[in-house]
Structures are given as C-alpha cells and as structure tokens.
C-alpha cells in the first residue's frame, strides 16, 4: 500500500519535463493553478484535460502509475463530485428517486469541479515526480528571493520544505516497518471491524512520532556539527540553468491562457 | 510446525517504476523443531524471506506452506491471524515497536490481541521479564524511560509472550554489547530446547549461526543457493567465499593453527569450546605418539 503512494516522490528520468529548470516548473505550476479557474465550459475544461494529459505524456511517467498512486485523492474527488450532485438545485431536474433529486446544473458542476481537481492534482504531482526535492527547494529559494527585503526567512523556509519533502519517503518506509511489527503482534489496521482498526492506530502512531522526533534531533545535531549557520553568505554548488525550453514552456502556458479565455462562455 | 517455501519469487512495489526484485525461485524447507540460520551478504534477500514466514509479505510467485496453511501467489489470503500467532517475529531493532504506557501493558499487547485472558497475559509478562534478566520494577515503567538494551529485551518479551510455535529472529542482537548479545542468544537457544520451538535466525554473524543452528541456508542475490548442516557449510571456505561470506572466527583460527602446527584437527570447530577441545585432543595425541 505504502509503496504505491507517490506524494513527494521523485522518479529520476531524462524527459523534457525532467530537464526543465525548477524555477520554470514551479512558476509554471503556480500560473497554471490560476489559469485553471478561467475555465467554465465543457470546451475549456476539455482543453485543460487534454493539455494535462499532454504534459503527463511528455514527462514519460506512465498514466497507470500516476492514477494508481493517487488513489487516495480519488476518494476525495468522488466525495466532492457527489456533494455537488446532491446539493445543487439549479437547472432541469434530471432524476428523481424519492429523497434523491439530481439537477442538470449539479451534474455539470460535479463534473467540472472533478476535472478541475484532477487537472490540478496531476500537474502538481508531475512537478514533484519529475523534480528532485533539492531542485524544488533551490527553485523556490530563488523565486522567493525578492521577499528577503521584507525580512522573510526565505532560506529557512526553503530548508524546512526540503527537509519535509526529503523525509516523506523515509517516514513512509518507517510506517511500513512498524505496521508490520504490530501486525506480527496481532494488531492489524488493514482488516477486521472498524472499531478494531481505529484501535490499531495508536500502536502505529506512537512509535512513529517517537522515531520522527529522534530523527529530527539527530538531523539537527548533524547540521550543527557540520557548522550550518543559515543562508547568510552561503554559496551554491548546484547552479540553475535557464534554457530555451523553459521560456518556451511559459509561452505555451500564456497561449493556453489565451485559448481558455477565448473559449470561455 | 513445518514451513515450506516452494519456488517463491517476490518483487517489491510490483507494477510501479520502483519495482525491485528481491527473491527468485527460493525453495526452502524449515522442519519442525529445527534451528535454522539464514545467512547471506547484505541485500541478499534474507529479510524478505523472513517476512514470508508469517505472511507479512505474500509471494508474487510460488507458494508458502505454513503448517497446514498454504499461501499462494495471486490468491487472496484472508484471516492470517492464526498464522501470525503461531509464527512470532522479532524484527531488527524491535524496540521501535514499543508504544504502550507501561512495559507490562506493552508485553501484554500481543497475547491479548490473540485473545489470551488478561491474568494469563500478565502472568506471562512477569515470567518473561524475569527470564530476560530485567528487574521486576520495569513492569510499571514507561518503555521509553528504559535504556536501549532494556528496551530491546522488553520488545523481545512482547513477541515471546504470544508463545509462538515458530520463532523468527531478524538480527535480534544488532547494536547490543557483546555480553548482552550472548545472553539473549543463549536465552533463545534455551527456549528453543525447552519449549521445542522451531527457530529461524537471520543473521550476519557466522559465529552465531555456527554456535546455535543445526541447519544453515545461504542466500545470495535473491536465491537460496545452499542449505545444509553447519559443519559442512562452514568447512567449505571456497563456497563461502563465492557468496562473499567468511567462516566463523573459530574455524579461521583452527585453519591458522593447523597451518602453523602442521597438524590436522579431528573435527571442525563451530564454537570456542569445541576449538579448545579439538586442539587439546590433537596435542594429547601428538604427545602420546612421541
């Protein structure tokens, strides 16, 4: 179960998307998130979906893997879909079975919101799947650079981010290990009645917290020992390299925005 | 209880880009009442085999027979509680699984999950704490207030309290001081004999394998390459070298002694005691013949 989760994972590769500059990718994602809200009709949502699939294709990450890894997200998606279907009361009545009434507008909204959600999740996942946590942090640090003037601790924020991203897989592995150890002691979170499953959470979470705190302490010590003193005057080993593809990707995005605006109802 | 692995194959994260093959065509028979050591170089698949022994991992190919229960690749296995009660696993660094308020409650956690009544579970906890050489006061303490070595013992007690028929040990003494190692390994061996347990020891330590096991299996690159008695496995230095393993210290010393003294000892020495005895015998014989 754990090994299929893909949040915060990075799959090394050398597709065009992998080779893009992290600054370009991060800006791309943020602008894209804004652009998504331009869409308001079947055509525009269709364009968004098509564009997203194109990006997935270019990243050479198998769609099946992506969908499989985002299963937990789909539960949320289905939930919101049904919320919209049941609670929107506009447009023509499509279906009426006693206590459930489904309206045209509800169905429309449900589908649109789901597509919007899906597109956002896909694009952001592609960002983390194709960019190593270190490059993401480097990118964010540079992009937030201007805010240093207003005393925003940019370097520290970037560091915190990279540490959390770095430790997601580690904590996942650890969860798996503790889960197995407790399963061997007869406490199984994956089966049995709901009450038993909830009870099985405690033996899992406590050891996990204990080890997470221990890890944090060890990490702090290790950084201290190596003379870490924050971002002041720190030079970079990895240099970022803005290339033609990066400019092109932002141009494409502008084109997409224009198209969405044009087809908007 | 017999455990039989038949042509078992296992891949981690199957059908994802992270897929990684860990086992290929592993066949291994662990007879009831035996003490089997599984040895192998780092990354040879030892720990993966171990997790098949109580169905924490299900084979992606082949099948595993645990007692009467058959777990087959591609077949959904339900209700594995019985299997897991009968096969207890002491994982590497088992102190990571401690969680309860007191040591007593933590040790009772396993047996009570399997429906052992509270008094009985508590009785076992008291008994085990004594057997493991811990002072009885620890029972009321929080497991997180104990020293590393004590935590290890408490965690081991937590597994033993389930009174499994098969005890699987994954490097149970890693990170302990030499005396603690010896005490814990001796305890496992005593339990093995007293309770007629079937014991499986996964270890890096050739010395432990030589001293305690009556059967040895070598894992290499996800294959189970050799199984046999410790005498034959450890006397074949060439074969051990092929799998990047070294014979135990006692045998290395025996070989050096033989080369220096120009005498061949009568038997292979799996323990320090045996080595001392073999050398003494050889020396006596040498004096008699003079």
Which positions does each model-derived feature cover?
Chain B
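Helix-to-loop junction immediately C-terminal to a conserved catalytic motif
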Residues: 54
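Conserved ABC ATPase signature
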Residues: 142-146, 150
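Conserved catalytic motifs of ABC-family nucleotide-binding domains
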Residues: 163
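Catalytic Walker B motif of ABC-type/P-loop ATPase nucleotide-binding domains
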Residues: 167-170
